[in-house]
Amino acid sequence: MAGTATCSGEGGMIPDERRYSSKWFYQCIQSRYGFNPHHLVLADGCEFFIGQGCKVGLGGHLMGQKVTDQVAEMRSLPAGIDQRSPARHPDWLGPDDLALKIQEIREATDWQIPIQLKLGAARVYDDVRMAVKCDPDSIYIDGMEGGTGAGPHLATEDTGVPGMAGIRQARKAIDDLGKSCLLYTSDAADDRLS
């Protein structure tokens, strides 16, 4: 990979992916499938998956036929069985809990890796205001352009907000709070958005 950042995605680390990635983010998802603190310390960053642009506010349903032996091993699940992911993190009730979770990850990694929050583009201004107060290093606005193999067709194909459409509201939310936070979107992960 030519200097690109790669994310583990939903479900753990693939050793070869980590080995060949110059920058690798470990994604912490709602279901905690495949979560391993030993893998977290191998990461260049941690991304908390809070929402996905192509299915904002929805959990996931991965059909059993997609749970191959490799997927099952990464996620610590039985192969061939349907799997569901909740829409929210079960140990968070609100922004205060998220701030505590960010602090836990910072302490577990000795403050050596940045923390990113992935938000689905929906109520961008309000969501970013809450997220920034939790003190992440960056926020990733995921627009409807992203894909998923675990969502209802109507949500993944016919709804959503484009990532670039959410950037203006996200930037305004950060500026209104007088805070500083890197901002990215799936359309243009670029420091010019910061």
Language-model-derived ranges and their functions:
Residues M1-S180:
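Active-site entrance/lid segments in N-terminal catalytic domains of soluble metabolic enzymes
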